Amino acid sequence: MGRIVGIDLGTTNSVVAVLEAGRPQVIANAEGSRTTPSVVGYSKEAELLVGQLARRQLVLNPRNTFANLKRFVGRGWDEMDDSSLSVPYTVRANEQGNVRVSCQVTEREYAPEELVASIIRKLVDDAATYLGEPVEAAVVTVPAYFNDAQRQATRDAGRLAGITVERILNEPTAAALAYGFDRSAARRVLVFDLGGGTFDVSLMRVANGVFDVKATCGDTQLGGNDFDQRIVDWLAEAFKTKHGLDLRRDRQALQRLIEAAEKAKQELSGVLSTPISLPFIATGPDGPLHIETSLDRPTFEGLCPDLLDRLLNPVQTALRDSGWSADDVDDVVLVGGGTRMPMVQQLLRTLVASEPCQSVNPDEVVAVGGAVQAGILTGELRDLMLNDVTPLSLGLETVGGLMKVLIPRNTPIPVRQSDVFSTSEANQSSVEIHVWQGERQLAADNKSLGRFRLSGIPPAPRGVPQVQVAFDIDANGLLQVSATDRTTGRKQSVNIQGGSTLNEEELQALLAEAEAKAGEDRRRRASIDRRNSALTLVGQAERRLRDAALELGPYGAERQQRAVETAMRDVQDLLEQNDLQELELAVASLQEALFGLNRRISSERRTDANPLQGIRNTLGSLKDELFSDDDWDEDPWNSPARSSDGRRIYRGRELNPWDDDFYR
C-alpha cells in the first residue's frame, strides 16, 4: 500500500500529517504554515483560491469567498439553524432540499462537498510536494457526532478531490491516538474537542496500544464560531442603537465584524480586556462611521452562558453512557482552538478533577492521530488497535411511526445486528424499509438516512411473512442495510447514500469535469508559479543592486549592474503584459546577469584586504567599458606568465630581458 496521509478537515483550519520513520509529522503548506484556512474562494477573474489566498479576500470579496463550509456538509436545508446560515455569502436550498452555495463570479451553485474537495486537494498537493511522490489515499477525520449522512458526504468530497478515503476517523479518537500511541500505562481519557463549528466529547480507555472508546456525544452545530457570533451581535447591536444601522445587513461590514470578533476572542484568552477598532465600518448622513470600543473577559463570558450549558450536557451524557464517574477520568485532552478560552477550561475543572493535558497542540493533534491511523492501515504501526463506537442509534420505522432501534449508540464498530419483522396488512406483497438515525422515540424526529423496498413477498395473512432486516456498520462508521424474505429467500440490500447531497450521476459528472479541466488547472497553476518566481527574482535583483552599490561604489561593477537593471526591466515589462512565453527567457537572462554580478561581488570580497582595491575596482570597470569585446582578457596587475622552458610571456609575446617595466 502506498503512502497514506492523515487529514484533519476542520471548520476553521485544516491540517495534514504523515507518518515518517514511525513518528507522525505535520506537513507545512506551500505558504509555510502548518495549518491551512478552510476557506475557498474565486477571484474577480474567476480564479480558484484555497487556503490563505482565499482568506485574504474575505473582506473585499465576501460574495465569492466561502468559509465554515463544514457545517453544511451532508446536511439538509431544514437541519440548518440561524447561526449556521449567518454568513456573508449566499446559501439556499435546491429542489431536493439540500444546501447549495451560490458564487456570483462563476455564476454557479456548488454543493458544499465540491468546495470542501478543493481544500482536500490543496492539502494532498502540499503533502505530495513535501514527500516527493503522489498521494492518492488519506485518513480523513470527522466529528464523532457526525451522522451517516455527513460521513458519506465527506467521503464524496474525497472522491471529488481525486483521492481514496481509506478511513473515516472520529476526531476525538484521532486525538487519543496522537496522545497515547507511545504510552504504555493504562489511562482513562476524556477528549474534549471544541472546534470552529462542531463539538465532541469522547471517553476511552488507553492501555498498551489498545484504544477502546467507551462513549461519545456532541453537537455538530456548536463551535468556536458561535462564540464569535455573540461578539458580532454585541458589536452590531451597540452600533445599531447608536447609529440606527444594522451592520449585519452589509456583507463587507459583516465580514469585518466576524474577523474582529474572532481576534477579540483569541486575545481574551490571554488578557482581561482587548480593544476593538473598526474604522470606516459604515457611512452615515454626516460622514464615515467607526467602531472604537473594548471588550473585557467578564462581558464576553456574560454573552455565552447558554453556550456553556450546551457544552456541559454532552459531557454528562458521555459519562453516564460509559458508566464512569468524573473521578474515574485520569487525563483530559483538549482539542480545537476553542478550548483555549478560559471559561471553557474553567467549566471542565468544575466537572473533572484532572487538569487538562498541555502536552499536545490542540490545532494539530487530530491530524497527527490521522497519520497514526494511516500507519496502522499500512502496517507501519503493528502494535496498535482501535475499537471505536457508533455515535448515534440506528433503526427503522415501524407501525405507528415508531423507531425500532437495531444498533444503540456507543455500540463498538464494526458491527452487524439484525431483527425479524412482518407485514402490517394481509396479502401485503412488499415492505418499505425506512432507515433512521437518532435518539428520539418517533422516527420522524430523527434523521432519515434513506429507504428501499423489498418486493415479491407471497400473499399471506398479516404478521405471517418474516422479513429479516440486517444493519452492517463498517470501520468507517458507514452503514449498509439488507432485507431478506425468509420464505422465498429474496434479498434486497443497499448502501445508505441518503446522506450525500450529490447523487451518483452528479458525482460522476463532477469527476469527469474535474478530469477534463485538470490540464487547464495545471497550466494555470504553472503560470501562477512562473509569475511568483519572476516576482521573487526581481526582489532579489533589487536587493543585490543595493548591496553592490554599497560595497563596490558606483563604478565598482557598473557593467554588471547595468546588465541586471536592463534584464530586470524586461521581466517587469513582461509581467505587466502577462506575456508568460517571453517571461521565461527574460527570467533566464536576469538570472545570468545576477550570476555575473554575484561573481563580481564575491571576487571583490575575497581580495578586499588589498590596499589597491579601490584603484583596481575603477580600472576593472574601465576595462569592462573599453574592452567589453574581450580583447583585453588579461589582468594588467598580474605578472607575466612563464612558459615551460622558463621564457616570460605577456599577451602572447616573448619578453626581452630588458622589459622590466612589466614587473611589479
Curated annotation (Swiss-Prot):
UniProt keyword terms in alphabetical order: ATP-binding, Chaperone, Nucleotide-binding, Phosphoprotein, Stress response
Gene Ontology molecular function: any one: unfolded protein binding
Induction conditions: By stress conditions e.g. heat shock.
SUPFAM superfamilies: Actin-like ATPase domain, Heat shock protein 70kD (HSP70), peptide-binding domain
Protein function: Acts as a chaperone.
NCBIfam families xref list: PRK00290.1, PRK13410.1
Name of the protein this chain belongs to: Chaperone protein dnaK1
Organismal lineage: Bacteria, Bacillati, Cyanobacteriota, Cyanophyceae, Synechococcales
